[in-house]
């Protein structure tokens, strides 16, 4: 029995010795690792000082102050990017809406002048286009159209509404022979016009006259 137990004791002793050596190596390496870590931190702080030099950093600043300035600069940059992204999205939405309105105006002109199209079909088509109008949350057709006109060269925004009333109010007099062809939609029977929302063809025909002229000077995104 004694010979068989001797190798097991030797193995156990060797394992204990290896563990102590590994623990000793870790203790010996710990100061070196800590020194390298601090060197990396100081090097990064010095790079931050150089990046911030000439703006807010004075001759000498504590490390905490350098970090605070860096955080403020990064936050400002992120806020600026967010504002730019929101502005680009708003401009893209306005261009899309302006193109949609322009297309709806052209459809309105066509169905108003084409004698082969039934008045009921024309009213249903325009009603569908108005219901499908891309609107921002909380906005209305008047707001969208006013923003589109205001963004155009020479556009007058809400000043393009018919005088003497709100955009929903009907025209004060029937269109004459020399008026815009888009106003021919008013010849549709009143029973059919009632199917169109209050923000209906009257608003399209009266408010988009200036949009048609201004669109020649500015390209519009077309939804087709």
Swiss-Prot record:
Residue ranges constituting the bHLH domain according to the UniProt record: 25-77
Tissue specificity statement from the Swiss-Prot or TrEMBL entry: Expressed in both undifferentiated and differentiated cells. High levels of expression are observed in several embryonic tissues including the nervous system, muscle and thymus. In the nervous system, initially expressed in the closing neural tube, then in the spinal cord, cranial and dorsal root ganglia, and brain neuroepithelium. Also expressed in epithelial cells of the embryonic respiratory, urinary and digestive systems. In the limb buds, expressed in skeletal muscle and presumptive tendons.
Molecular functions (GO terms): DNA-binding transcription factor activity; DNA-binding transcription repressor activity, RNA polymerase II-specific; protein heterodimerization activity; protein homodimerization activity; RNA polymerase II transcription regulatory region sequence-specific DNA binding; RNA polymerase II-specific DNA-binding transcription factor binding; transcription regulator inhibitor activity
Domain of life: Eukaryota
Composition skew (Low complexity), residue ranges: 158-171
PROSITE patterns found in the cross-reference section: BHLH, ORANGE
Biased composition annotated in UniProt, kind: Basic and acidic residues: 8-25
Keyword Transcription regulation: yes
Gene Ontology CC terms, in alphabetical order: nucleus; transcription regulator complex
Record text on subunit structure and interactions: Transcription repression requires formation of a complex with a corepressor protein of the Groucho/TLE family. Interacts with HES1.
Protein name: Transcription cofactor HES-6
């Amino acid at each position: 029995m004694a010979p068989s137990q001797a190798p097991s004791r030797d193995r156990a002793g060797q394992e204990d010795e290896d563990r102590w050596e590994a623990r000793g190596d870790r203790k010996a390496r710990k100061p070196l690792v800590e020194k390298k870590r601090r060197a990396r931190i100081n090097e990064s702080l010095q790079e931050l000082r150089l990046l911030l030099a000439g703006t807010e950093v004075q001759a000498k600043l504590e490390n905490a102050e350098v970090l605070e300035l860096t955080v403020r600069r990064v936050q400002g940059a992120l806020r600026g990017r967010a504002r730019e992204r929101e502005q680009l999205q708003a401009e893209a939405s306005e261009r899309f809406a302006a193109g949609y309105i322009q297309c709806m105006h052209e459809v309105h002109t066509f169905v108003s002048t084409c004698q082969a199209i039934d008045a009921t079909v024309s009213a249903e088509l325009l009603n569908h286009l108005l219901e499908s109008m891309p609107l921002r949350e909380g906005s209305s057709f008047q707001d969208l159209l006013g923003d589109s006109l205001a963004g155009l060269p020479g556009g007058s925004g809400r000043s393009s509404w018919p005088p003497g009333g709100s955009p929903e109010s009907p025209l004060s007099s029937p269109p004459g022979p020399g008026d815009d062809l888009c106003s021919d939609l008013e010849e549709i029977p009143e029973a059919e016009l009632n199917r169109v929302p209050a923000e209906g063809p009257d608003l399209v025909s009266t408010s988009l006259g200036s949009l048609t002229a201004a669109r020649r000077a500015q390209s519009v995104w077309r939804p087709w």
